[in-house]
């Protein structure tokens, strides 16, 4: 028999010793796998409402900052479409995350389990997209205003935009957790 790699041939004793070194999984290793899964699922159950609560906080702050951004003629958030968009999406995000947080902590089932998981996932995705869309639409306008002069109006707008971005990050994490729940949930 030829050896194309110029290696020494494998002997029967080498195969037997390798077989002895491998061991069958013990019942304890199966138990630890189940325990690890339970811990992971428990972490997901705790992390999802926490990230939604953080999103609620940042959305509410973005809303409050943008509403209070009125500093006279030409320095009113209501004069600019982009800032009104940030305000509207902050309101939507605040309402959505407040509803989700309330639904979680009240422990009441509004929908059946399958529908609830689908609403969580799709709602997180849609609202996260709206948040980043609103922030990215207002950033260029704020940069143009900052080139002219830097004042409290642009600082407030930049703060509201930053809070919307932080809300997006929190809700994007929540969407990951919702996606994990959706992918591991059996609908049988």
Curated annotation (Swiss-Prot):
Extracellular compartment segments: 68-84, 146-156
One Gene Ontology CC term in the entry: plasma membrane
Polar residues bias: start-end ranges: 24-34
Cellular location(s): Cell membrane
Residues spanning the membrane: 47-67, 85-105, 125-145, 157-177
Region (Disordered) residue spans: 1-34
UniProt entry tagged with the keyword Nucleus: no
Keyword Cell membrane: yes
Spans within the Cytoplasmic topological domain: 1-46, 106-124, 178-188
Coiled coil stretches, renumbered: none
Recorded superkingdom: Eukaryota
Assembly notes: Homodimer and heterodimers.
Similarity comment: family membership: Belongs to the Casparian strip membrane proteins (CASP) family.
Name of the featured protein: CASP-like protein 4B1
Organism: Arabidopsis thaliana (Mouse-ear cress)
Taxonomy of the source species: Eukaryota, Viridiplantae, Streptophyta, Embryophyta, Tracheophyta
